Curated annotation (Swiss-Prot):
Taxonomy of the source species: Bacteria, Bacillati, Bacillota, Bacilli, Bacillales
Disulfide bonds: none
Originating species: Bacillus cereus (strain ATCC 10987 / NRS 248)
Keyword Nucleus part of the UniProt annotation: no
Family to which this protein belongs: Belongs to the AdoMet synthase family.
Protein name per the record: S-adenosylmethionine synthase
GO biological process, one term: S-adenosylmethionine biosynthetic process
Residues the record lists as binding Mg(2+): D19
Keyword annotations of the record: ATP-binding, Cytoplasm, Magnesium, Metal-binding, Nucleotide-binding, One-carbon metabolism, Potassium, Transferase
Cofactor: Mg(2+); K(+)
Amino acid sequence: MTKKRHLFTSESVTEGHPDKICDQISDSILDAILSKDANARVACETTVTTGLVLVAGEITTSTYVDIPKIVRETIQGIGYTRAKYGFDAETCAVLTSIDEQSADIAMGVDQALEAREGQMTDAEIEAIGAGDQGLMFGFACNETQELMPLPISLAHKLARRLTEVRKDDTLSYLRPDGKTQVTVEYDENGKPVRVDTIVISTQHHPDVTWEEIDRDLKEHVIKAVVPAELIDGETKFFINPTGRFVIGGPQGDAGLTGRKIIVDTYGGYARHGGGAFSGKDATKVDRSAAYAARYVAKNIVAAGLAEKAEVQLAYAIGVAQPVSISVDTFGTGKVSEDVLVELVRNNFDLRPAGIIKMLDLRRPIYKQTAAYGHFGRTDVDLSWERTDKAAALKEQAGL
């Protein structure tokens, strides 16, 4: 069946968005703990509103970290430094409510079901079962060099650029909160051919005019990020379409950890299992298995075994082996999906302990993922973005 030309849209947000503030606080706390106690169990949730930060969750660790100090340093780094913003690093209240991990959950994670029943030794599985049941997806496609869908790739780059021109004073009137959205047109073969629409909403100083913002963002943000060949005379631009965006950040909207899961992943282009990432250590398969699924999918595409690949993993709490592994190549595979699943089983250890070891996840690496996407990053070295398994997959597939 012939495909029709169609549009697809993805969005991103800046690090000053209320939900992203929360993600960064949660991951900053996680990193601080992991830097002193690599085996800590952390599930850290944050909420922000006008003048207030609440940090809650379950943390089991042998170390101590100064949570209010970490919170204030994170907010300072984002750029909320003035009380007139309705939220700033010095004057905001910080409340904490931290418990230890449930003993019932810890029992399942500490010693997986297979080990307790004698099916494997503790040494083989490193005594780690999945921290919860659930399903996770990973995706890759050959639309961009980083093997990500083009709409989310461009949306992230625009959001990052908004922050850059604010922090380096190119556009000193910008404030931390902002959102971007990109609509891409695909041809009959499913290939991206042009950018149809760009939406940017950015918080700003009250005295700047809309005309100035419109001109500056087109010149210093859009032109700097979006390849000129993707923009034509029909491309539509909506810059601060309400006309004014002065009240923003936690003063404008309350924020919560884990509320930007589509921004964090593939911009809606691939399926999502529902679990959020930030504030969770690697024994939580919501995070570690989603990273592993991306690693698998990216290596499949990098090996030339498919033009696009979506990998689903699923787990039961306290059980180390995934209960299911599936691969969907959307008709682009060079080998059957059954063969791909077998290749995945033979080349990737997808037990939680295996993932942690394979991707070296007991490190303080998470704050850098908490804004501008966890996947397709070229500005930081993330283990799940490497394509070091591609050659072996290609050889074993006989290609």
